[in-house]
């Protein structure tokens, strides 16, 4: 029994730190809506940690003296850091769900066949779709730039200048550079 007590204490201590880490991670999603876009875009789930920090920065940035520009710049930096973690696979963001079991090449081939079939038709809408398709980025870094541009152009109304200090207490670790 003498040996069991220290082991139980150690397990309890590790369990508490794990619970604190989980709780702290969960608190960072309190003011976040993820990478909300009207469309399902590539990298949306992969960029979610950066989006959570960005959303918290927009909600609580003024309380901690972080400007909207600083939030947006940190957002781009965080997304580029995520892209660099992909290493040589930085051409595309990892897929989620069922597509994870397929290779990146197989998924790309399947996508290109679907696009080719859809765009081979000669309608006006398909001509427009072809134009848009060729403007879309093909790399993780390209998508990061697009997400960054989107918040720069359309995020002004979301940056909060009237946030209550009480709602942001304990969220310092959810902000850029903290």
Curated annotation (Swiss-Prot):
Residue positions where Pyrrolidone carboxylic acid is found in the record: 131
UniProt note on tissues of expression: Expressed by the venom duct.
Entry keyword set: Calcium, Disulfide bond, Hydrolase, Hydroxylation, Pyrrolidone carboxylic acid, Secreted, Signal, Toxin
Proregion residues excised on maturation: 98-130
Enzymatic reactions: a 1,2-diacyl-sn-glycero-3-phosphocholine + H2O = a 1-acyl-sn-glycero-3-phosphocholine + a fatty acid + H(+)
Signal peptide annotation: 1-24
Coiled-coil ranges from the UniProt annotation: none
SUPFAM superfamilies, per the entry: Phospholipase A2, PLA2
PANTHER family the UniProt entry points to: AGAP006772-PA
Name assigned to this protein: Conodipine-P2
Natural source organism: Conus purpurascens (Purple cone)
């Amino acid at each position: 029994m003498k040996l069991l007590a220290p082991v139980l204490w150690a397990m309890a201590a590790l369990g508490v730190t794990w619970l604190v880490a989980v709780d702290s991670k969960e608190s960072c999603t309190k003011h976040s809506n993820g990478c909300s876009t009207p469309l399902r875009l590539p990298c949306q789930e992969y960029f979610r940690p950066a989006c959570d920090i960005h959303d918290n920065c927009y909600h609580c940035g003024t309380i901690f003296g972080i400007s909207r520009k600083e939030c947006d710049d940190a957002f781009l930096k965080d997304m580029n850091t995520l892209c660099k973690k992909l290493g040589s696979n930085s051409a595309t963001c990892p897929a989620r769900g069922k597509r994870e079991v397929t290779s990146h090449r197989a998924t790309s081939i399947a996508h290109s066949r679907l696009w080719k079939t859809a765009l081979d038709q000669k309608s006006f809408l398909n001509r427009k779709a072809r134009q848009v398709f060729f403007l879309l980025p093909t790399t993780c870094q390209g998508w990061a730039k697009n997400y960054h541009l989107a918040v720069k152009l359309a995020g002004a109304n979301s940056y909060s200048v009237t946030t209550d200090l009480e709602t942001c207490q304990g969220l310092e670790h959810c902000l850029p550079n903290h």
